[in-house]
Amino acid sequence: MSFVVVIPARYASTRLPGKPLADIHGKPMVQHVVEKALQSGADRVIVATDDERVHSALASFAEQAGVEVCMTSQDHQSGTERLAEVCRHYGFSADTIVVNVQGDEPLIPPAIIRQVADNLAAASAPMATLSVPIQDAEEAFNPNAVKVVTDKEGYALYFSRACIPWDRDRFAASDRAAGSHEQIGDHYQRHIGIYAYRAGFIQRYVDWAPSVLEQVEALEQLRVLWYGEKIHVAQALQAPPVGVDTQADLDKVRALLAN
């Protein structure tokens, strides 16, 4: 099964400037992500960046590894818009499966990159993603942990920062479960931010106006459900380790790779 991995690598970052080039044991962070993507069995791996410094830092490695680096606009409002530009630039056919792997996930398991591509190929949906089980009530009530509920076929019904589904019998009396490490039912799933798309759908997606729900929740994927399309969701074969948003995250990743 053929698929392409696109890795958006935007240089500017409020919390960690120059994040794609952050050094992790002698390599820029984005190179670690590229290496994971290459191990997934992707036919092509493309880094989409808005900064010549990223392009230059990867040039030698990319040439040796057969990786492409695509310069994109600095004006995109989202990673999906950057992805759409890449699809137009390379002229991907409408049925091409494109996996969007974030450039700040240097520890992402290659197996789940392949998994989300395979899932999309088998699904009656233009988009697929993954989830992992939520471990306890503290995570379920954490607004930074995005929850997802699906139908019996594995298609998303809704994504939310709120605790969904709401366990009426457990939570109705009070919110005492918030902040608790009490175990929670296995029907609670946390969404993880890896997506596979059919290339023809990406352009439709970015042409749609933002939806009310995505603006309320600050969750871009809700636009897809708002306009009546499906998102396939499966439980990830492996839970991905921490991504990098802050200096503390970067320090954790360096420590993990050192071991």
UniProtKB/Swiss-Prot annotation:
SUPFAM superfamilies: Nucleotide-diphospho-sugar transferases. One of its GO terms (cellular component) is cytosol. GO terms for biological process: CMP-keto-3-deoxy-D-manno-octulosonic acid biosynthetic process; lipopolysaccharide biosynthetic process. InterPro entries: Cytidylyl_trans (IPR003329), KdsB (IPR004528), Nucleotide-diphossugar_trans (IPR029044). Transmembrane segments: none annotated. It is found in: Cytoplasm. Its EC number is 2.7.7.38. It catalyses: 3-deoxy-alpha-D-manno-oct-2-ulosonate + CTP = CMP-3-deoxy-beta-D-manno-octulosonate + diphosphate. Gene3D superfamilies: Spore Coat Polysaccharide Biosynthesis Protein SpsA, Chain A (3.90.550.10). It comes from the Bacteria. Coiled coil: none annotated. One of its GO terms (molecular function) is 3-deoxy-manno-octulosonate cytidylyltransferase activity. Keywords: Cytoplasm, Lipopolysaccharide biosynthesis, Nucleotidyltransferase, Transferase. Pathway: Nucleotide-sugar biosynthesis; CMP-3-deoxy-D-manno-octulosonate biosynthesis; CMP-3-deoxy-D-manno-octulosonate from 3-deoxy-D-manno-octulosonate and CTP: step 1/1; Bacterial outer membrane biogenesis; lipopolysaccharide biosynthesis. Belongs to the KdsB family. Activates KDO (a required 8-carbon sugar) for incorporation into bacterial lipopolysaccharide in Gram-negative bacteria. This is 3-deoxy-manno-octulosonate cytidylyltransferase.
